[in-house]
Amino acid sequence: MPTIQQLVRSERRKINKKTKSPALKSCPQRRGVCTRVYTTTPKKPNSALRKVARVRLTSGFEVTAYIPGVGHNIQEHSVVLIRGGRIKDLPGVRYHVVRGTLDAAGVKDRRKSRSKYGTKKPKS
C-alpha cells in the first residue's frame, strides 16, 4: 500500500488492457482484400481442413481470417468484411469473415442460425 505522500507525489497508474484484435483498431468490423485463400489443419486433438484467408485490411494490417460455414465463394482479390473472434484450434487466427456481405455470399441451404451465416429466409 502506498502512503498518502507517495500518492500525492505520483498518482496511481491505469492498467492498460491489451486488445485481442489490434487490426480492427477499435472498430466493430474492417474491410479488406483477400491475398490468399487456403485450408489449414487444427491443433492436436482435432483433425480437419479449416478454410482460412489471408486478408490485407484498410487499416494496413495483413491478418488471417476464418471463413465459417459449409462452402464459400471467396477467392483471391475478393473484398470481404472482417470481424473479431478467434478460432481456438487454429493458432494465429483471430478474425472471422462476415458471410453475406460484400463479396462473401451467405451459406446455401442454411436453416438454423441463418443470421450468423448471411442466409436469407427460405421460401417455404
From Swiss-Prot:
Keywords recorded for this protein, A-Z = Chloroplast, Plastid, Ribonucleoprotein, Ribosomal protein, RNA-binding, rRNA-binding
User: Subcellular localization, per the record?
Assistant: Plastid, Chloroplast
PROSITE patterns documented for this protein: RIBOSOMAL_S12
Tell me where on the tree of life, at the top rank, the source sits: Eukaryota
Residues of the region (Disordered) are 1-28, 104-124
An example of a Gene Ontology BP annotation on this entry?
A: translation
Against Gene3D superfamilies, the record matches this protein to:
Nucleic acid-binding proteins
- InterPro entries per the UniProt record, alphabetical: NA-bd_OB-fold, Ribosomal_uS12, Ribosomal_uS12_bac
The entry's cellular-component GO terms read: chloroplast; small ribosomal subunit
A Pfam family the protein falls into: Ribosom_S12_S23
Describe its partners and assembly state.
Part of the 30S ribosomal subunit.
PANTHER family reported in the protein's UniProt record? 30S RIBOSOMAL PROTEIN S12 FAMILY MEMBER
The entry's family comment says: Belongs to the universal ribosomal protein uS12 family.
Q: What does this protein do?
A: With S4 and S5 plays an important role in translational accuracy. Located at the interface of the 30S and 50S subunits.
> Any idea what this protein is called?
Small ribosomal subunit protein uS12c
Record organism: Porphyra purpurea (Red seaweed)
Q: What is the lineage of its organism?
A: Eukaryota, Rhodophyta, Bangiophyceae, Bangiales, Bangiaceae
